[in-house]
Regions:
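Polar, enzyme-active/binding microenvironments
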Residues: 1-373
Length: 373
């Protein structure tokens, strides 16, 4: 068994009974209580840290393993998901914008041109895209939106941009760098595109571009290139959240970056790294949910986090774990539209919270990657 913490705030994890186990227990100085199990059961590993911030290294399963996990505890806040009115189309990797009560959802995988609008009661078809696409970027409102990049049957990496006026999509200036699985933030005539996957060496890109309503101009690059990331905010005040990075480590990342209209800077990392999640909100108040948390293994998750401009807090989970879901709304009134469960779905999930209340700590194990130096 391994341990961490102090005599009055201890943590015990891994070991054998003699069966190799993944169980974790916490000690308060008087008694032990069960906590979240490790991802990989093992014994004879190493441990260090505190009760609410520990690390487990290596061990045997019974073969030698080098995997590393961290034990994390975060504030747990009130906020609830509920099932809304289903869309007419079931698809994954759609794009969304607008508010939770007036969202616009379009495209999807396989590449489709359909658009749907919600009026607070029911969904109706909107104007069809000129370019059927999936995994694109988007920004704006239900009646004034823009979509850019993405992929389709051909070409595989789009640079095409389209603007929506509430009924019709029209072509606009192309992205400088065609890409898919990128981040998008802002408004129809003041949008920001960043990150993504492009047909260049390495695949991942860090470049950002700013849209003025007709043409794109280069902005400064992100610190870490990545794709399959999520976004929130405006053209001059955006967040690039989590995603998949190829260097270093070929892994999903917890890293978050903020854009101030000129440059990117590192801000507080998310609690759970993920690829294919969704987010909404602003640079100082964001909601993150769903996605694929495991590298190179398909999973869906229901994990939800809220950002307050300083750090991330755990919120109530989605009712249906999804990846490739579209988003709209705000941290207090959010929407998750469709996705993969692993079957495609047209389910709408609505998040609502008023005056969030801190409900204590939520603890879990999270996989870590590392590099040799």
């Amino acid at each position: 068994v391994c341990g961490a913490g102090t005599p009055t705030a201890g943590l015990a994890f891994m070991g054998a009974t003699p069966t190799i186990v993944s169980c974790t227990e916490e000690y308060n100085g008087l008694a032990w209580s069960n906590s979240k199990s490790m991802i990989t059961a093992r014994n004879r590993g190493g441990g260090a840290g505190l009760q609410n911030a520990a690390i487990a290294m290596g061990g045997r399963t019974p073969t030698d393993v080098s995997c590393v996990e961290e034990f994390v505890c975060a504030n747990y806040q009130v906020g609830a998901w509920s099932i809304g009115v289903s869309m007419t189309i079931a698809a994954k990797n759609r794009m969304g914008t607008g508010t939770a009560n007036s969202p616009l959802i379009w495209g999807g995988n396989p590449a489709i041109s359909s658009t749907e609008e919600f009026n607070g009661t029911s969904w109706a078809a909107g104007g069809a895209l000129n370019c059927a696409r999936t995994t694109a970027g988007g920004a704006g409102t239900q009646n004034a939106a823009v979509t850019f990049g993405g992929s389709g049957a051909a070409p595989f990496y789009f640079s095409a941009t389209e603007k929506y006026d509430g009924s019709t999509w029209s072509s606009s200036g192309n992205l400088i760098t065609g890409r898919r699985q990128l981040g998008g933030a802002g408004l129809e005539n003041a949008a920001l595109a960043f990150g993504g996957n492009a047909p260049v060496t390495g695949g991942n890109v860090a470049c950002s571009e700013e849209f003025n309503g007709s043409t794109w101009a280069s902005g400064n690059s992100m610190i870490t290139s990545r794709y399959c990331l999520t976004a929130a905010g405006t053209q001059n005040s955006a967040l690039g959240i989590s995603g998949y990075r190829q260097s270093p480590g070929n892994t999903n990342t917890t890293e978050v970056e903020a854009y101030d209209g000129t440059s990117w800077s590192t801000v507080a990392s998310v609690i759970n790294k993920r690829c294919g999640g969704a987010s909404s909100g602003t640079q100082n108040a964001a909601l993150l949910f769903g996605g694929n948390c495991a590298f190179n293994v398909f999973t869906t998750n229901a994990l939800t986090e809220e950002y307050n401009g300083t750090g991330w807090n755990v919120a109530n989970q989605l009712l249906l774990g999804v990846t490739g879901t579209a988003s709209a709304g705000s941290p207090t009134s959010g929407l998750a539209a469709g996705g993969y469960t692993p079957s495609v779905t047209n389910t709408i999930q609505n998040f609502n919270t008023t005056n969030p209340v801190n409900c204590g700590l939520y603890c879990f194990w999270n996989s870590l990657s590392y590099t040799t130096t």
